[in-house]
């Protein structure tokens, strides 16, 4: 059984989700949000790093999936998102986690069956797949979806011996 951490990065709210991959499916372990407030960017990035590090210490995942940066209309927002993502990746790398990156389309395809699914469709599928009785907060739901996507990709790669085949600096590029 493998514990998987999913991260939905953000400069103000970073969602996290932890699932246990049993080999026959995934079980919910934990989820939540790291709220950084509205202070200086450097302090918000430190809060992302510290928060992700604390989640890793608390739950002990061995691998992490994180969403790739998408091109936003606002270049400044995309840059800040990329920096928050970097802080989360460094926290995972510091802890020795294997890290994989997924596009939003890959996550939606893996969870809802279509890359065009909206956040509510993904949230409902996360609830169904993990047998949750209540809706998780949307950022936590997205992080759980990333963890489930990572579990799905890990299962499809293991029989072919591809896990770790394209590792660079601790990150698995798919």
Swiss-Prot record:
GO biological process: DNA recombination; DNA repair
Known catalytic reactions: Endonucleolytic cleavage at a junction such as a reciprocal single-stranded crossover between two homologous DNA duplexes (Holliday junction)
Binding site for Mg(2+) 1: 8, 139
Active site (UniProt): 8, 67, 139
Cofactor: Mg(2+)
UniProt-listed InterPro entries: RNaseH-like_sf, RNaseH_sf, X-over_junc_endoDNase_Mg_BS, X-over_junc_endoDNase_RuvC
EC number: 3.1.21.10
Assigned GO CC terms: cytoplasm; Holliday junction resolvase complex
Binding site for Mg(2+) 2: 67
Subunit-level organization: Homodimer which binds Holliday junction (HJ) DNA. The HJ becomes 2-fold symmetrical on binding to RuvC with unstacked arms; it has a different conformation from HJ DNA in complex with RuvA. In the full resolvosome a probable DNA-RuvA(4)-RuvB(12)-RuvC(2) complex forms which resolves the HJ.
Name of this chain's protein: Crossover junction endodeoxyribonuclease RuvC
Species: Stutzerimonas stutzeri (strain A1501) (Pseudomonas stutzeri)
Recorded name of the encoding gene: ruvC
């Amino acid at each position: 059984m493998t514990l998987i951490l999913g991260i939905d990065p953000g400069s103000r709210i970073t969602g996290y989700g932890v699932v246990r991959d049993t080999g026959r499916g995934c079980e919910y372990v934990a989820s939540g949000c790291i709220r950084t407030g509205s202070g200086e960017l450097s302090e918000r990035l430190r809060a992302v790093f510290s928060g992700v590090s604390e989640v890793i210490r608390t739950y002990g995942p061995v691998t992490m999936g994180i969403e790739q940066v998408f091109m936003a209309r606002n270049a400044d927002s995309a840059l800040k998102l990329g920096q928050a993502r970097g802080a989360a990746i460094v926290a995972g790398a510091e802890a020795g986690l294997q890290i994989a990156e997924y596009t939003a389309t890959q996550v939606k395809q893996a969870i809802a069956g279509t890359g065009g699914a909206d956040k509510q469709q993904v949230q409902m599928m996360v609830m169904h797949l993990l047998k949750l009785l209540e809706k998780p907060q949307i950022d936590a739901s997205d992080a759980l979806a990333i963890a489930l996507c990572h579990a799905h990709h890990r299962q499809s790669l293991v029989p072919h011996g591809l896990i770790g085949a394209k590792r660079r600096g601790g990150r698995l590029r798919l």
